[in-house]
Amino acid sequence: MMAKLMITVMMVLLLSLQQGADGRSKRWRKNQMAASSIMRNLITARGVPPRFCRDKNCNEDSECNQWCTGGCSSVKGNCES
């Protein structure tokens, strides 16, 4: 009787540990997906300057110049694609 009770307690303990590990892996997977989504958005948005940079001269504004992937046109002063 005592052995049966010990086996039952150990099985419950192992199952609860397994559920805890599954919960951590799901949370880790969600965090990884969120991080990769943010990085993907940053990478794909790199070539598109923000709205406030579209009418500015990128030679004069260093913050807008960083968004120019093709460089800044010395003649027009806008981003080259």
Swiss-Prot record:
<dbReference type="GO" id="GO:0090729">
    <property type="term" value="F:toxin activity"/>
</dbReference>
<feature type="disulfide bond">
    <location>
        <begin position="53"/>
        <end position="68"/>
    </location>
</feature>
<feature type="modified residue" description="4-carboxyglutamate">
    <location>
        <position position="60"/>
    </location>
</feature>
<keyword id="KW-0732">Signal</keyword>
<comment type="similarity">
    <text>Belongs to the Pg turripeptide superfamily.</text>
</comment>
<feature type="signal peptide">
    <location>
        <begin position="1"/>
        <end position="23"/>
    </location>
</feature>
<protein>
    <recommendedName>
        <fullName>Turripeptide Gkn9.1</fullName>
    </recommendedName>
</protein>
<feature type="modified residue" description="4-hydroxyproline">
    <location>
        <position position="49"/>
    </location>
</feature>
<feature type="modified residue" description="4-carboxyglutamate">
    <location>
        <position position="80"/>
    </location>
</feature>
<keyword id="KW-0964">Secreted</keyword>
<feature type="modified residue" description="4-hydroxyproline">
    <location>
        <position position="50"/>
    </location>
</feature>
<keyword id="KW-0301">Gamma-carboxyglutamic acid</keyword>
<dbReference type="InterPro" id="IPR026210">
    <property type="entry name" value="Toxin_Pg"/>
</dbReference>
<keyword id="KW-0379">Hydroxylation</keyword>
<keyword id="KW-0800">Toxin</keyword>
<feature type="modified residue" description="4-carboxyglutamate">
    <location>
        <position position="63"/>
    </location>
</feature>
<feature type="propeptide">
    <location>
        <begin position="24"/>
        <end position="46"/>
    </location>
</feature>
<keyword id="KW-1015">Disulfide bond</keyword>
<feature type="disulfide bond">
    <location>
        <begin position="58"/>
        <end position="72"/>
    </location>
</feature>
<dbReference type="GO" id="GO:0005576">
    <property type="term" value="C:extracellular region"/>
</dbReference>
<feature type="disulfide bond">
    <location>
        <begin position="64"/>
        <end position="79"/>
    </location>
</feature>
